[in-house]
Regions:
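Basic helix-turn-helix/winged-helix DNA-binding cores
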Residues: 1-103
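Acidic interhelical loop/turn segments
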Residues: 143-162
């Protein structure tokens, strides 16, 4: 891997820089806190990735090992904290334009585009699966929101805004699915198909 790519900060790197700016932690604590915060709902970061990122960030001087009363036992017991250089790198990365201009490609939309090729009955079954999934996720996020509000003590916090956005998106998609089910009997092929010509 080229050196420039190794220095490029990934989402897991940024999540850890932010977490370790709050307070020093060792890898196990960081994993436990990320799990408690349900970070995997909004950032792709696995347990092994935490340790890989900690090592990378330490090599780049973006985190440092702090003193601990625990005996040295490898990365599990090394306590890391974000350095001033790490906070600056995080702040610089958060200014990039692509945070606000990237468009997601949800797998369900890909499925919908290809669904006209599905066997009879599959469309309705998949819509039902999607609806059930969204209803479960909505319930889970509503419970998460109650928990967050209790923990932070107000509604003007990033976590509240993030979960509120997800709740709004789930509700919006559920409304759209109901509309889709109503319109399904009228589904038809395109009337004016255009083919690209070289």
């Amino acid at each position: 891997m080229p050196a420039a790519r190794k220095r490029e900060l990934t989402t897991p790197d940024l999540v850890l820089l932010s977490l370790l700016a709050e307070r020093p932690m060792h890898g196990y604590q960081a994993n436990a806190e990320l799990e408690r915060r349900e970070v995997r709902d909004w950032a792709g970061i696995s347990r092994p990735q935490v340790y890989y990122s900690l090592e990378k960030l330490a090599q780049l001087g973006l985190v440092r090992t702090s003193e601990t009363e625990l005996p040295a036992a490898g990365p599990e017991r090394s306590v890391f904290q974000t350095t001033a250089k790490g906070r600056a790198a995080l702040a610089d990365t958060l200014e990039r334009e692509e945070w606000a201009t990237h468009r997601e490609r949800p797998p369900f939309l890909t499925w919908l585009a290809l669904s006209w090729q599905a066997r009879p009955g599959v469309f309705r079954r998949q819509i039902k699966r999607r609806r059930e999934f969204l209803e479960n996720e909505l319930s889970r996020e509503e419970a998460t929101l109650r928990s967050i509000k209790q923990e932070v003590g107000h509604r003007f916090h990033e976590a509240v805004w993030m979960v509120s956005l997800m709740i709004g998106q789930f509700r919006g998609e559920l409304r759209w699915l109901r509309k889709l089910e109503r319109e399904l009997p009228r589904r038809a092929h395109a009337k004016h198909t255009v083919v690209a010509v070289r």
